[in-house]
Each structure stands twice: as C-alpha cells, then as structure tokens.
Amino acid sequence: MKIIDLLTKEKLSLSFEVFPPKTQSSYDSVKKATEEIAKLKPAFMSVTYGAGGGTSKYTLDIAKNILQEHGVPTLAHLTCVSSTRETVKERICDIKNSNVKNVMALRGDIPSDLQNSNKDSWDYKHAIDLIKEIKEIAPDLCVGGACYPEIHPESANQDEDIKYLKEKVDAGCDFLTTQMFFDNNLLYNFLYKIREAGITVPVMPGIMPITNANQLERAIKLSGSFIPQRFKSLVDKFGTSPEAMKQAGIIYATDQIIDLFANGIKNVHVYSMNKPDVAENILNNLSSILN
C-alpha cells in the first residue's frame, strides 16, 4: 500500500521508524526487534539508511521482511549525498522491483571526508535531485521528503527553507515527514507558514521519545531542536534514574501525540529506534484514542 493512501484516510494512525543493522553480525537481533514492532500493527514502518550509505545494503532487506512476513506497509529510506548516479539508479530499481511501494528521498548527512570537497563534483547536491531521479525511473513509487519545523541547519532563514521545500514538493514529493521537535507550537506555526506558501501535501509530525539523558544530548546535537523548559525540568529531575527517565520520556511523547491528534493531526510518525517496548507503551497509552 502507498503511504499517501493511508494519509488521506480519516482514521487516526501511528507509524514507527526503525534502523537496519550496521553489520551482518547484528542482523538477526535487529531483524527480531523490527519484527516485534511490526507485530504491533502500526499504520506503516520506515527503515532508515546508514549515514553515507553505510548500512544501506540492509535497508531494503528489512523493509521487505516487515512487509512480507507481517503485512505492514513499509517506507525504505534512500540517501544520495555520497553516492554515484549509477549506484543510486541501481538502488531505485531495486526498490521498484520489490513489493515496497514507498521511498523516503533524502540528501543525507555529509560525511566528514566530503565536508571540504567541491560540491560541483557531486552527482547529487540536494534531495530534489534524488526526487527527480526517482520520479523518472520509478514514477509509481510514493515519495516522501523531510521538512524542518525549526529550519534546516543549512538554511539562512525559514523563508528560504520553505521556498526550497516547495521546490521539493513540486519535484514530486507526495508527503512530508518532520524532523523531531519537542514543542508542538513550533509545528503548528510551521504548518501555517507552509500552507500559506502553497504546500498542500500531507505532513506527518515526527516524534522522538527521549528515554535517557544521553539520547537527548545526541538529539540536540543532530537536530538543534529547541528544548522547552517543561522538558528540561523533566530531564533534570529524572535523568539520573534510567527507569524513571524512560517512563517520563514515553509519557512526554504520548502527551505530544495526544495534543497533535486533538489539534487536527491524523497521522504521527514515531522515531522508535528499534525499541519494541517503547513502541508498545506508546500504543497502549493511546489505545482508546486510536480505536
């Protein structure tokens, strides 16, 4: 099933993101974790792509397994920043020839060895280049793109960011998923601005349950997310107690999702990080709301 078809339904839904193994030795444990999440029957599951393509060879394998063994629609991530055009075309064809109907088109983080290189030598400089390639090779694939309620780290300002986002959508993005955020008002303001700019495709908020203090530090470093005082206080109080922090983080994420549903959002994507217990707890917290 195409994700765009799921997103146009009136039913409230939750989906989860997982990541592939980094090595063959961890394949079985990662596969088991993703299958445990698939058994919860989310609306769909997305499978990430390693930085610089590092774990890319397992992305489609995990996505196909979830779909074939558990009947859960999947979204395979694809990045392009450090890849040749030949390699990317091959991977697009692999997805096209599988039963996976959805692809998340991302530029990807720039590897350290390319930070100071000449971008003119890259086959792909931006996600829009990848989106156009996918639409040319596999026009029937449903294509997702990323968006940033708090502005892309490389954009000069939000107006520039939204202008580029509109270009991505015009190039063929069927839906958008947001970077993590911890203050829902940032999302609501962002949605107003992009609708004013003529971006009409569905937007799925991305929610990251923070279950330990170190995870929060990494999240801030990666995304630059604003941390509201309410969440800072939570981490200050419970951050040194693993079980308390885990429970508090799950409840905070659940509260965010409930508020999103209450304010007209129908579909929320949870960055569950291969943690079946976290995914299950959030689903249990929302069971009556989702049903």
Functional labels for PLM-detected ranges:
Residues 18-21, 48-52, 77-83, 108-109, ...:
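Active-site beta-loop-alpha junctions enriched in small/polar residues
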Residues 1-16, 23, 133-135, 232-233, ...:
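N-terminal amphipathic alpha-helix/helix-capping segment at the start of soluble metabolic enzymes
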Residues 13-29, 74-86, 144-160, 237-251:
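Active-site mouth loops of central-metabolism enzymes
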Residues 17, 45, 95, 168, ...:
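Conserved, mostly hydrophobic/aromatic
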Residues 3-6, 25-27, 53-65, 84-90, ...:
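Active-site-adjacent beta->alpha loops and helix N-cap segments on the catalytic face
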Residues 133-175, 251-263:
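Active-site/ligand-binding-proximal alpha/beta "capping" segment
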Residues 121-122, 126-148, 198-250, 255, ...:
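Active-site pocket-lining/capping segments in soluble small-molecule metabolic enzymes
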Residues 24-37, 59, 85-92, 157-167, ...:
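Short, acidic/polar
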